[in-house]
């Protein structure tokens, strides 16, 4: 059952929250030995939360919007009583979290049932979730391939039918990449939209949090439940709630929709270009739009990511570098050694860059681009080729996402299934101006309703 069917089934009494919970736990038990999406399961908590929903329904109470819906979170979200690993060996020695992360609190208030924590790249520094401490998360559509990252467990858990909803983080593409490679829906909200309090940071000035889901409705319901100001999070600049569910079915009539060319075409393989072409045709988009300074924006994002990420872990890099995984330790060290002038220059450029990007949206409401250059490569792949150019695999997965998140724009990643692509999915980015998540979701709903974007479980 999809998100809406689960919620309606519980509300109507056709099924119980406990039955839904037990079915999800059974699916996890049957599949996760191969997929490796989960790093912990909160079984007792899940059953207690599900039972509480069933009690409320039996009393005739009006149920909250996500009542009984199972979900799981990337293991950089605090879960009360659980150590927040952030994909690392180093964090194993930390005490258990004393409280849930704010977004987990808000989903609990909305009635969702937490089933556990999910695998990720160490400290969120990666695009593949080939974690050497906890093992690689495998793509449910071909278990010899990566699930993407750094929120790989969050994408794989949905694609494997383990949960209909998950939470991830996105600094340079870490929601959109696994959504693309696993064939699920993902939403990276506007920078500053959702509270980050109670999560383990990576790059404070770029980190975003958001949902992955089995449907556009799932994204919208979860997103609305998590919205709200947080005066205790200096990075949360949202001043009000802007519900997306009431406008989700308004369609795209009158919206100005363009297709990103240049960098976003040159760095997209045949399947990615085909996915965009079909989405553009469906959404009535024919004009090509050029995103300003995409390559420089990506380079500046790399500088800031390495610098902030490295400095955050400086003490551990000095005394226990051997406890970092090989895929991240060298990048953290190089980030610490970068001249501060590089960091300052990148941040100054970012202000100008945002202004240039925002100017695009004077003429356009939605812009379409591929989410990843190719579909999921095999686990262990070191190099990929895109249109005749050879790229190192791991950073190349973010070629098309980094320029967008660096500008802070909201994006929906829509799962499409191009022909002649070995049966593998690839995502399409639906991008809007800051604070216009609902436009992305509306366009996604059109792609879903026409069958262009969908899940295959």
Curated annotation (Swiss-Prot):
Know the name of this protein? Answer: 1-carboxybiuret hydrolase subunit AtzE
Keyword Repressor appears in the UniProt entry: no
Keyword Hydrolase applies: yes
Record family assignment = Belongs to the amidase family.
Say which domain of life the source belongs to: Bacteria
List, in alphabetical order, the GO biological process terms annotated in this UniProt record. atrazine catabolic process
User: Catalytic residues?
Assistant: 74, 150, 174
Q: How the protein assembles, per its UniProt entry?
A: Heterotetramer consisting of 2 AtzE and 2 AtzG subunits.
- Tell me, in a sentence or two, what this protein's role is: Hydrolyzes 1-carboxybiuret to urea-1,3-dicarboxylate and NH(3).
According to UniProt, the reaction catalysed is: 1-carboxybiuret + H2O = urea-1,3-dicarboxylate + NH4(+)
EC annotation?
3.5.1.131
Tell me what gene encodes this.
atzE
Q: Which InterPro entries match?
A: Amidase, Amidase_dom, AS_sf, Carboxybiuret_hydro_AtzE
Cysteine pairs bridged by disulfides in the record: none
Q: Which GO terms describe its molecular function?
A: biuret amidohydrolase activity
Name one matching Pfam family.
Amidase
Query: Which pathway features in its UniProt record?
Result: Xenobiotic degradation; atrazine degradation
Q: Which UniProt keywords apply?
A: Hydrolase, Plasmid
Q: Which NCBIfam families match?
A: amido_AtzE, PRK09201.1
